[in-house]
């Protein structure tokens, strides 16, 4: 049975960030910064409440009549109790004999073109641990993108405007960044396990390292770009946020309405139509919060029973990173044009170049992950390198087609006249089947 390290990491980040935020808010209060104190508490306590609801909802404690657990969740101590419960189950699992064992069937990754199906016995203790890991993974994603991401942006903005980084603020920013990266990592692992549910997925340590570097560069550069733009154009940042928010929030619903599918009723039997709508709106809000800072790795599909699209769409991935790179470049350009005196001692061109290179580095680590370290790369129809080679061939063919014709000189005119004077019988006209199509040119 696997050691519940993911549960321990989630609880540690949750407690550390909440403690650091409460301590920093008291510092703001003593300094008279009421607005910074209110925003710091908001971005700390709101995700705490959402995490409690998530853990309570996943374990279905309302139907199990557990008033003590409900009280602990109301006191914001639910994650600590759940972590204690997880380790009690883990350490007692080897002492008691399992009275009931379920059998799961998973397929191995193909080896030499063959894939075997393996049966595995799952006891009650291991099943409970799997449920706890799943609940804490979802809670980590909620904590990261509905709490840590706004918190990091706020504290970095305060540091830029005050031109000072205190110990408490730097500690909170560090913990918030780790929480966001960890949440994005859990989101990647969840996406892989959902899309390849019938396979036994094993993620190697190097894959975790690659995802960590990919998400670290992507999220850090995105937050810095937003803070720089906000510091010089405070009004226009509201427009940017609203455009991003409504674009990602309405996109799944537009696809759902265009599909003509009936309203989903099988999310939870105990939920009414209003409750189902609230849950779907919350999931869409979480999906929007993730995509505002990084690639979500999962595509919300409301008309699907799993609410998640299991198909990996490379086209959406490419479009997202192209649009995000262009948006970051435009925001940095506007910051460079309207920067104020607080950036007097900052080399603006070098900073812009570093941020753009940092975002490209994130994309590079993403490509490395999908090329070498993805646990299900054997199931891909084509690898990243093969797709890049095909794109390069087509690009070279397009450049050849657009190459301008050379100017015709006197010798060319004279040779054309000589050809016109030759008998028509000597002229050869190409047959229709002798022309190369675009695919042949691309493969040449």
Curated annotation (Swiss-Prot):
Any Pfam family: XK-related
Organism: Pan troglodytes (Chimpanzee)
Annotated Low complexity bias: 423-432
Cytoplasmic compartment residues: 1-2, 59-68, 162-171, 230-235, 299-317, 371-444
Transmembrane is among the record's keywords: yes
GO molecular function: protein-macromolecule adaptor activity
Protein name, per record: Endoplasmic reticulum membrane adapter protein XK
Region: Disordered, residue numbers: 408-444
Membrane topology: Multi-pass membrane protein
Biased composition (Basic and acidic residues): 408-422
Chain positions found as Phosphoserine: 115
Underlying gene: XK
Assigned protein family: Belongs to the XK family.
GO CC aspect terms: endoplasmic reticulum membrane; plasma membrane
Taxonomic lineage: Eukaryota, Metazoa, Chordata, Craniata, Vertebrata
Single biological process term from Gene Ontology: amino acid transport
Transmembrane segments: 3-23, 38-58, 69-89, 141-161, 172-192, 209-229, 236-256, 278-298, 318-338, 350-370
Assembly mode: Heterodimer with Kell; disulfide-linked. Interacts with VPS13A.
Compartment list: Endoplasmic reticulum membrane
Extracellular side: 24-37, 90-140, 193-208, 257-277, 339-349
Keywords: Amino-acid transport, Disulfide bond, Endoplasmic reticulum, Membrane, Phosphoprotein, Transmembrane, Transmembrane helix, Transport
Role according to the record: Recruits the lipid transfer protein VPS13A from lipid droplets to the endoplasmic reticulum (ER) membrane.
Keyword Transport: yes
């Amino acid at each position: 049975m696997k050691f519940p390290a993911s549960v321990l990491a989630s609880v540690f980040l949750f407690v550390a960030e909440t403690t650091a935020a409460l301590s920093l808010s008291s510092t703001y209060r003593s300094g008279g910064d009421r607005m910074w104190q209110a925003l710091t508490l908001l971005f700390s306590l709101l995700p705490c409440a959402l995490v409690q609801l998530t853990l309570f909802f996943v374990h279905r404690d309302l139907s199990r009549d557990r008033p003590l657990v409900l009280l602990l969740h109301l006191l914001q101590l639910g994650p600590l109790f759940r972590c204690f419960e997880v380790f009690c189950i883990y350490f007692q699992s080897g002492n008691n004999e399992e009275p009931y064992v379920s059998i799961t069937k998973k397929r191995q990754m193909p080896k030499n073109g063959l894939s075997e199906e393996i049966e595995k016995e799952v006891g009650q203790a291991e099943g409970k641990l799997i449920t706890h890991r799943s609940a804490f993974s979802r809670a980590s994603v909620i904590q990261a993108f509905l709490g840590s991401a706004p918190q990091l942006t706020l504290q970095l903005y305060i540091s830029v405007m005050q031109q000072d980084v205190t110990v408490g603020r730097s500690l909170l920013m560090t913990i918030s960044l780790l929480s966001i990266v960890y949440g994005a990592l859990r989101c990647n692992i969840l996406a892989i396990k959902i899309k390849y549910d019938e396979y036994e997925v094993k993620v190697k340590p190097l894959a975790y390292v690659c995802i960590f570097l990919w998400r670290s560069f992507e999220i850090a550069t995105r937050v810095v770009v937003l803070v720089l733009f906000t510091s010089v154009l405070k009004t226009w940042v509201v427009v940017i946020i609203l455009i991003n928010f409504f674009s990602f929030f309405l996109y799944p619903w537009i696809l759902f309405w265009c599909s003509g599918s009936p309203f989903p009723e099988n999310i939870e039997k105990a939920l009414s139509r209003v409750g189902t709508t609230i849950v779907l709106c919350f999931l869409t809000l979480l999906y929007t919060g993730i995509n505002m800072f990084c690639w979500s790795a999962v595509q919300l599909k409301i008309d699907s029973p799993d609410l998640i699209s299991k198909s990996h769409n490379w086209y959406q991935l490419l479009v997202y990173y192209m649009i995000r790179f262009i948006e970051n470049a435009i925001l940095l350009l506007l910051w460079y044009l309207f920067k104020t005196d607080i950036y007097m001692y900052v080399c603006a061109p070098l900073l812009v170049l570093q941020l753009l290179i940092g975002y490209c580095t994130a994309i590079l680590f993403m490509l490395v992950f999908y090329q070498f370290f993805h646990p299900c790369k054997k199931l891909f129809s084509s690898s990243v390198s093969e797709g890049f080679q095909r794109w390069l061939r087509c690009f070279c063919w397009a450049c050849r087609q657009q190459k301008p014709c050379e100017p015709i000189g006197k010798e060319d005119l004279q040779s054309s006249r000589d050809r016109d004077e030759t008998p028509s019988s000597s002229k050869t006209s190409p047959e229709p089947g002798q022309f190369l199509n675009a695919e042949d040119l691309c493969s040449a």
